[in-house]
A protein has these predicted regions:
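A general structural motif
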Residues: 295-304
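Nucleotide/phosphate-binding catalytic cleft detector across ATP-hydrolyzing
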Residues: 1-12, 16-200, 218-220, 243-244, ...
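Glycine-rich phosphate-binding loops at beta-strand->alpha-helix junctions
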Residues: 258, 315-335
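Short loop/turn elements that form and flank the Walker-type P-loop nucleotide-binding site
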Residues: 195, 207, 315-317
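A conserved active-site cap/scaffold subdomain adjacent to cofactor or substrate pockets
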Residues: 226-248
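A short acidic Gly-Thr/Ser loop motif
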Residues: 6-12, 76-77, 201-208, 214-217, ...
């Protein structure tokens, strides 16, 4: 069975074609990354240009995999999303738990409720409580007096989803399934033990930083903040009056969130604005890192606030996994 996944990010468009077979690992038939500058904070700057780029990526992927692409699974960013944790309790008077009881609990819950201008992206039972004992598997077959279902619902703005869907409607490609972008990112880097024992995965992207929380092989939470590695690049460019190209190079080659006594003595020559005059000046490495550190602190603090907002910090999950381009910043794993 052929499956196609597409991710339209703020710096690149990605497409993967895979062959899913029973009792074996997926076989990757094609993987395409294509740079784009036509998206800013998940909004299309030029619809026609981004449509042409996506068409080009799909064509390359189809040619590379020797398949005809008619439908896709599409990643959807979750910046400005809303998460709901809710439950539903029923009394079954020491009877055997049956599917009928689960359906009753679902029907009397907020499972089918939605907010105006939002679309439900994920909505499922995260755990069960049988007489106050938490279960993560199906409780059918147990005797109990009280059954409680704990749900998680993730909603994204309809306009965002319709914008992305409309792109593929014009290309006459069917969107088979919508997938939260942080979930795709986490599944690519977390192993079975990570997902089972508990893990927080933070994806430090170019224009946003997303996070997911896994435990007992279930997604407990997904969200994102609108700050990414591009903000660090812009901070450097403004802070030392250099070009964006130079700032990106400085961040990659010299950037760190950890200070060292030698930073004061490591001198770097950089072009200054306006760049067309070809003028240069010298700065030390600590100047760059003093710009980087506050932005990284702000980003991680916003992520921490998201966890506290939904009381997820109380789960005391210790396993933290970093991914994305920003995770390559020196010292961030030890910060």
């Amino acid at each position: 069975m052929i499956k196609v996944g597409v991710d339209i990010g703020n710096s690149k468009i990605s497409c993967v074609v895979s062959d899913l077979q029973k009792n074996s690992l997926p076989k990757i038939l094609s993987f395409i990354n294509y740079p784009t500058s036509n998206i800013n904070k998940n909004a299309f700057i030029n619809f026609q240009l981004i449509k042409d780029e996506v068409r080009h990526v799909i064509t390359l992927a189809a040619k590379d995999s020797q398949t005809e692409i008619k439908s896709i699974n599409l990643n959807i960013p979750v910046t400005d999303s809303i998460s709901f944790f809710y439950d539903s309790k029923i009394e079954i008077e020491n009877e055997l738990i049956m599917d009928l009881h689960l359906k009753k609990a679902i029907n009397q819950s907020d499972f089918f409720d939605n907010l105006i201008n939002y679309e439900i992206l994920m909505n499922y039972i995260a755990s069960y409580e049988v007489d106050n004992k938490k279960l993560f598997g199906n409780p059918v077959g147990n005797f109990a007096k009280i059954l409680n279902l704990n749900f998680y619902k993730l909603m994204v703005k309809k306009n965002l989803i319709n914008t992305f869907k409309n792109l593929f409607y014009d290309l006459q490609i069917h969107v088979e399934q919508l997938v939260p972008t942080p979930l795709s990112s986490a599944l690519a880097v977390l192993n079975v033990d990570d997902r089972d024992l508990g893990a927080i995965c933070i994806d430090l992207g170019e224009a946003s930083t997303s996070l997911v929380v896994f435990e007992h092989e279930k997604l407990l939470f997904a969200d994102a903040v609108s700050i990414g590695s591009k903000n660090i690049t812009n901070d450097i460019a403004r802070g030392i009056s250099t070009t964006k190209e130079s700032a990106e190079r400085l961040k990659t080659l010299y950037g760190s969130v950890l200070s060292s006594p030698s930073d004061e003595h490591e001198i770097i020559e950089i072009p200054i604005l306006p760049s067309e005059f070809g003028q240069f000046k010298q700065i030390n490495r600590s100047t760059i890192n003093n710009i980087i550190k506050p932005r990284v602190e702000e980003t991680l603090e916003l992520v921490w606030q998201k966890l506290r907002q939904y009381n997820l910090h109380k789960r005391k999950i210790k396993n933290l996994v970093l991914t994305g381009g920003g995770s390559q910043l020196e010292g961030i794993a030890d910060y």
